[in-house]
């Protein structure tokens, strides 16, 4: 696969802890990790079939094959079992002007749920659209940065910051005293991405 290995490790550990905590507390919650069909993976297309790698501005076949299609397939399977589904997304308008436009275009005044663009009986709920980045991190880092299922939100914040917060920096202290604004604006992409000239998040991991 092509995910950043450090981020992948964190997400797999989090997924296992969510499922374990849910089982222990007898909650009907299960974390699922979705994969693309083996024939649609990046290396199968590029090395196996000779596909040219994605390049800007518009040649971006990877997102649909590696992310969108597998998720849509999973959603459709859930609908077959349950009749309908609500998809929660963590998108925010403050991420970028393009993201803000995209969210606004899909919003329906007076409704919390928006119909999915392509899938019947699927609805999208975006609970964080108006919330600032610093408030998201403030919430995640409360309770000493430990999530209800036992993962470290400080570690997650460290990944987004590109620095180790375990030694000299007290993130929770900064939040409580309002001394330093929380940023954590990094974005993680595929380590082999050919759409960007420089992968800053990957470089920060190398520097560490």
Give, region by region, the residue ranges found by the protein language model.
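Nucleotide-activated chemistry modules centered on ATP-dependent adenylation/adenylyltransferase
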Residues: 1-208
């Amino acid at each position: 696969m092509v995910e950043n290995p450090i981020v992948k490790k964190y997400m797999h550990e989090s997924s296992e802890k969510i499922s374990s905590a849910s089982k222990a507390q007898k909650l009907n919650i299960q974390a699922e990790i979705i994969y693309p069909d083996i024939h649609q993976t990046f290396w199968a297309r590029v090395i196996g079939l000779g596909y040219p790698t994605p390049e800007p501005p518009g040649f971006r076949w990877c997102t649909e094959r590696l992310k969108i299609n597998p998720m849509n397939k999973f959603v459709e399977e859930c609908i077959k079992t349950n009749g309908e589904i609500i998809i929660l997304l963590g998108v925010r308008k403050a991420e970028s002007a393009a993201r803000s436009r995209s969210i606004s275009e899909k919003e329906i005044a007076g409704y919390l749920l928006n119909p999915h663009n392509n899938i019947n009986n699927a609805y999208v709920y975006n609970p964080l659209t108006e919330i600032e980045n610093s408030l998201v991190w403030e919430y995640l880092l409360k309770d000493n940065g430990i999530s209800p299922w036992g993962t470290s939100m400080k570690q997650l914040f460290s990944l987004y910051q590109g620095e180790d917060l375990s030694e000299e920096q007290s993130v929770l202290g900064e939040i409580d005293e309002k001394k330093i604004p929380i940023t954590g604006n990094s974005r993680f992409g595929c380590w082999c991405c050919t759409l960007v000239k420089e992968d800053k998040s990957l470089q920060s991991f190398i520097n560490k």
